[in-house]
Amino acid sequence: MAGARGRVAVIGAGVAGLTAAYRLQRAGVAVELFEADARLGGHAHTQRAVGADGRAVALDTGFLVHNERTYPQLVELFRELGVPTRRSEMSMSVRCHGCGLEYAGARGPAGLLAQPGALLRGRYLRMLAEVPVFHRRARRLLADPAAGEPTLGRFLAAGGFSPFFVSHFMNPVVAAVWSCAPEVAGEYPARYLFAFLANHGMLSVTGSPSWRTVVGGSQVYVERIAERLTAVHRAAPVTAVRRHPDGVTVDTADGRRTEADAVVVATHADQALRLLADPTDAERAVLGAFRYSRNPTVLHRDASRLPRAKGARASWNYELPACDGGAGSVRVSYHLNRLLGLDTAEDYLVTLNEDRHRPVAPEQVLSRTVYEHPIYTPESVAAQRRLPELATGRSAFAGAYHGWGFHEDGCRSGAQAAHALLGGVLGGGANLGGARLDGVHPDGVQLGGVQLGGVQR
């Protein structure tokens, strides 16, 4: 058996797999990390561009920001790795191509009243008045276990909230945070969603944490973990994981077979299920309950994706095709200059699910990527409660789907997977180098007195 404490195969080099591999190796385990892509990091994805002045700039297009209050595992990891961070500006706007409304939060009255005549918009003023009502009723639901488990859509309908509030406030909150289509947002479990909002100070007009971003891009932390690992296999897609009484066997697409004492499967839930050659009934039921949304993403310099009113321009810019929200995908553009503190003449933006009727100017496109994000339903939330059942024997699972789908959730689940194996099949108890397994769930954005959520994973 290689290594003083055994040998573990870790499948997937996103934040969950990287954290698990790092924690296990620090505890004296021989680790082999397998990643299907040639690039490590998953949603920690830093791309490079050259500005008009000839300077190269690092641009994150996946995971962007974190905070000390709700990302304790990630903050601890960054501290250990010596990853430099800086403050980020967090604000969010909504732009409706139907009625022409543009407003932004966390930018004071200038953001909420960014357009001349905003105070003459009756539906908009009613929406602003409905926000504190929503906050109170959401807190009331959380405080009452007997209130049932309504979906967000049913909660809003029962509360008599206006269609304008739903389409111009509530849907942007959920859709921007979880990168889901507006019609999917209404199916989210209300209690689960409100617990997230409450944990991030987003069910009141104050209390949002201070946000930070990694200096030089999130790839900095990925590289610092990778250089500490002894066996990293890039462009090595795993085709099957077989478990047997004496260990596990990992097969890769190039025909290679790796033997290990245990395995951490740190992929999306549906991918993990496909990799298992012998899934148990519990694994089929739990992992099979998760669905994912595919979000085509464009990195570009087309500033027309921002609101026309300069006072409404924000870090997160949500677009509505029509007042009813319209069917289809979430459309949001992240203004990297604000989020990453870029000192450049050019505007750099990341747009999710660009509108084919209002496409990004082709000459301004720098790259295209597709990211997947978990979709939360009553079924997947119920399955999530059963995930600890799967961390038995010689296999453990990790991924952001273990929490709210964000970077902290992936980091925490990776540490927990390492902890489970060290305290189980690898024996000798767990020693994770001081890492804590406490903390609360992930991200959110505050809109000043009007709060909207949204933090890219």
What does each model-identified segment do?
Residues 47-74:
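N-terminal glycine-rich dinucleotide-binding loop that anchors FAD/FMN and/or NAD(P) in oxidoreductases
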Residues 68-195:
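Mobile amphipathic helical/loop "lid" adjacent to a hydrophobic cofactor/ligand pocket
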Residues 25-50:
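Glycine-rich FAD pyrophosphate-binding loop
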Residues 48, 104-107, 325-439, 443, ...:
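Conserved flavin/dinucleotide-binding core of flavoenzymes
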Residues 4, 27, 237-372:
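Mid-domain catalytic core of redox enzymes
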Residues 195-253, 258:
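Helical element adjacent to the flavin cofactor pocket in flavoenzyme catalytic cores
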Residues 6-33:
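N-terminal Rossmann-like FAD-binding beta1-loop-alpha1 element of flavoenzymes
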Residues 1-8, 26-27, 49, 377-383:
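Extreme N-terminal leader/targeting segments of oxidoreductases
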